[in-house]
């Protein structure tokens, strides 16, 4: 008893030390954000207010890293394509690069079109709206991370701006037309994610998983899938990065993307051919070919997430900074470029939040939503890559959470349909087998089929292997080759595990109203503090 208590005390002590170190690092980062605002911010006499806003922006960025980045690397970690440490390192680097290189366009979207300019002409009121929205979004994300619920950072910030804007100038201040486009993108994104993931999962099943010679099929198909992913990402990079230096037409963009995709195809084809002698003709062995593509997908998603969701952390901060520099036009239509120091606060905050507090939700997304193998994880990741890059290019602050979970929904729905079909197929196969046999063998065969129907996946695999080895048994002799093949196909199509989605769906539903309520309350609280203190 005493030894157990000592071990529990040591465990609690180590956890406390670890948590204390995390808090210390987070505080150091917030101090760094304040120093950046002090040194590089140009807020004239309102420097203290800008420093406070920078701290809140850094706090928001850390919460985005802790909560939202899990969607990018969760499938890769959950399928064991990459370790937790490797995933965090890749995601942190790519998040920072995406935020700094390609994050400006979405920042401009967040910055001035959610609240109609003509309703808030006072710079002081506008700054309070932005502060309230930023803090409300950060607080809700913090709570969601503590309870282990991956939520939309876009929903959190937009809800906060809505609530604070309505508290400041009423419902008429909200640009409902613009928000309707954002809401539409929130619906379209998970739907696109689901449909694309379903398509690729079915494609992989038809072209690889259901083939007798899985090894040869995978060596042919996987390089094309990687090339497609490369095309999407390279085209995105050309559009987002090169357009700042030199404007190119669509034809040139597509041609450059195709050239890069072809190069990746050739390199990856050589890679899989070198790996071919080590592969076996089995599902598990073929799965290993998806390791590198999954790591590649995690990097792409992280880059796109940094480009897209950095706006949620620094959009309001950029608006506050610009307003403090030019108070005469707080909601003007002309948007200045976002200062580099603000981009650094957002990018570094996301990377630090991921490193310190990201593993919890990475495990949630990677294993609790659904149990994935590498093929299924690749379908989800590829679907998310295509959807989120398209959305980011359009300048829409969509939710990567919705995209990834939408893809999981799609994969789960397809697997559920396949399971139902496999059950019906098994019933037909059973009837056909029973009808074709009689006598003493029939009783033994019926017993085998009943055990097969009730067995889990691992047990089914062992039972099918026993048919190959037990050539002298009645079952092995009486079950025809075609009947064994049919049973094998039923085994392949059974679903491993149903997704646990209630917590995530509930979090989606309450994010906007909760963040809006917090935004309104914080706006009122800021006004009260300024008036009486």
Swiss-Prot record:
Keywords: Cell membrane, Membrane, Phosphate transport, Transmembrane, Transmembrane helix, Transport. The chain crosses the membrane at residues 23-43, 47-67, 81-101, 129-149, 156-176, 182-202, 221-241, 248-268, 286-306, 338-358, 372-392, 509-529. It is a multi-pass membrane protein. Its main location: membrane. Pfam families: PHO4. It comes from the Bacteria. GO terms for biological process: phosphate ion transmembrane transport. GO terms for molecular function: phosphate transmembrane transporter activity. It is found in: Cell membrane. One of its GO terms (cellular component) is plasma membrane. Potential transporter for phosphate. Belongs to the inorganic phosphate transporter (PiT) (TC 2.A.20) family. PANTHER family: PHOSPHATE TRANSPORTER. This is Putative phosphate permease jhp_1384. The lineage of its organism: Bacteria, Pseudomonadati, Campylobacterota, Epsilonproteobacteria, Campylobacterales.
């Amino acid at each position: 008893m005493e030894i157990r208590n000592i071990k529990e005390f040591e465990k609690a002590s180590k956890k406390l030390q670890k948590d204390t170190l995390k808090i210390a690092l987070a505080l150091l980062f917030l101090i760094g954000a304040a120093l950046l605002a002090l040194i590089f911010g140009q807020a004239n006499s309102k420097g203290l207010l800008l420093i406070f806003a920078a701290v809140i922006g850094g706090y928001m960025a850390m919460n985005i890293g802790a909560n939202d980045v899990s969607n990018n690397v969760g499938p890769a970690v959950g399928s064991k394509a990459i370790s937790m440490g490797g995933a965090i390192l890749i995601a942190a680097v790519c998040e920072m690069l995406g935020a700094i290189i390609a994050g400006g366009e979405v920042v401009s979207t967040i910055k001035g079109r959610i609240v109609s300019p003509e309703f808030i002409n006072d710079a002081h009121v506008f700054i309070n709206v932005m502060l309230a929205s930023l803090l409300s979004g950060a607080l809700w994300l913090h709570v969601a991370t503590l309870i282990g619920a991956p939520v939309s950072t876009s929903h959190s910030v937009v809800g906060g701006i809505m609530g604070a804007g309505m508290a400041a100038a009423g419902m008429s201040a909200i640009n409902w037309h613009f928000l309707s486009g954002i809401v539409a993108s929130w619906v379209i994104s998970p739907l696109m994610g689901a449909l694309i993931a379903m398509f690729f999962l079915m494609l992989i099943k038809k072209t690889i998983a259901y083939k007798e010679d899985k090894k040869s099929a995978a060596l042919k198909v996987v390089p094309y899938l990687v090339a497609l992913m490369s095309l999407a990402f390279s085209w995105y990079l050309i559009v987002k990065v090169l357009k700042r230096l030199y404007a190119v037409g669509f034809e040139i963009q597509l041609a450059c993307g195709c050239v890069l995709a072809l190069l990746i195809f050739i390199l990856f084809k050589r890679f899989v051919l070198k790996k071919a002698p080590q592969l076996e003709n089995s599902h598990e062995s073929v799965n290993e070919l998806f390791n590198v593509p999954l790591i590649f997908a995690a990097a792409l998603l992280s880059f796109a997430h940094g480009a897209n969701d950095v706006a949620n952390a620094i959009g309001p901060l950029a608006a506050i900074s610009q307003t403090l520099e030019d108070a005469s036009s707080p909601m003007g239509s002309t948007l200045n470029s976002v200062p580099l120091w603000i981009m650094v606060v957002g990018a570094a905050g996301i990377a630090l939040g991921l490193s310190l507090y990201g593993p919890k939700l990475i495990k949630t997304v990677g294993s609790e939503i659904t149990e994935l193998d590498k093929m299924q994880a690749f379908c989800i990741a590829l679907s998310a890559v295509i959807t989120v890059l398209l959305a980011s290019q359009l300048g829409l602050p969509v939710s990567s959470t919705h995209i990834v979970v939408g893809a999981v929904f799609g994969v789960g729905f397809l697997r559920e349909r396949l399971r139902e079909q496999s059950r019906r197929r098994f019933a037909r196969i059973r009837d056909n087998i029973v009808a074709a046999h009689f006598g003493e063998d029939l009783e033994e065969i019926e017993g085998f089929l009943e055990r097969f129907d009730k067995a889990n996946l691992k047990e089914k695999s062992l039972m099918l292997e026993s048919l190959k080895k037990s050539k002298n048994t009645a079952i092995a002799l009486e079950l025809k080759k075609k009947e064994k093949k049919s049973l094998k196909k039923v085994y392949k199509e059974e679903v491993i595990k149903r997704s646990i989605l209630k917590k995530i769906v509930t979090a989606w539903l309450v994010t906007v109203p909760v963040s809006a309520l917090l935004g309104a309350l914080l706006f009122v609280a800021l006004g009260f503090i300024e008036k009486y203190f």
